[in-house]
Amino acid sequence: MKKAAIFVIMLTAVLVLVIAGCSSQGAESKQTIGIIQYVEHNALDAAREGFIQALSDNGYNDGENISIDTQNAQADQSNLSTISDRFVSNNVDMVLAIATPAAQSIAGKTEEIPILGTAITDYVAAKLVESNEVPKTNVSGTTDMNPIKEQIDLLVKLVPDAQTVGVLYTSSEDNSIVQAAIAKEAIEALGLTYTEVTVTNSNEVQQATQSIIERADAIYLPTDNVLASAIPVIHGVTVQSKTPVICGEAGMVENGGLATLGINYYDLGYKTGLMAVEVLEGKAEPASMPIQSASGFDFAINGEVASEIGLIIPSDFTDYIIK
């Protein structure tokens, strides 16, 4: 009897250890994805939501078999650095970097953790990869490079009397610098006059907008994070001067721009999420994953803004009015 009791105790102890071991392995198997987002605005939020949905659609759900740590830097470089340091010290399994400054921050902290980016215009110019075809770094992802020439063509169709086009952008954002250069070429190729005003932060946006409306018949805004967050400010100035504003993406149009032919950022984020699934499943590594781009572009026209500035939308564009 005594031997039987001892056997039961020993068997119980073994079972406890086995169960504890299984629990430990289960906890260890839950991979952590850190999301570092540069700033909060419609486009970047949509990209994040699309990314998470793609994971969920493929069986990766936050709190179940993965852990997602989402951090927003609120357009602050010191916040970006702090968040990046935290992700590295916590040894997360993967990072989603939303917008160029976020990707540059985390990529500058680690060469080991896989990084996927989204809402990034030019990975090569941002020094995140060696080439779009074969990154050869721990970074890959999706690009939000716009059809800039076609956006300038849209401006001309909506504002045919425009002679001078002003481009407003943030001089500290590599993605905006690249887009401004492309826009300049497209504008001048049409025989129009190009002018520009730059800002370094959101506090300068109102004054910069007041400056550019004095010399431009219409304004072009690239996909610029500072400007996307300050669209209501830009709208407040341009609606008074009745200056049309063509934007780089639909979220900017929804918040006060006139029109765009732009990317669906939710779809872009979703595509990035599908890339993440490949990495999580060990089927691919960022170093050999080509940068992917949007599969299509959508027209979006803000009818309320058109009415406010007295602009008549051509009949062949009325189907694209979103509000």
Predicted regions span which residues?
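Short, low-complexity disordered leader/linker segments with a strong preference
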Residues: 1-32, 57, 61
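An alpha-beta-alpha
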Residues: 33, 51, 140-187, 289-305
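Extracytoplasmic "Venus flytrap"
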Residues: 33-52, 58, 69-78, 172-176, ...
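Structural motif
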Residues: 67-89, 198-212
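Beta-alpha junction/loop-to-helix N-cap segments that form part of ligand/metal-binding clefts
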Residues: 73-130, 221-248
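Hydrophobic alpha-helical segments within soluble ligand-binding/sensing domains
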Residues: 123-164, 263-284
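Pocket-lining segment of extracytoplasmic ligand-binding domains
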Residues: 168, 174-249
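Hinge/cleft segment of the Venus flytrap/periplasmic-binding protein
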Residues: 278-323
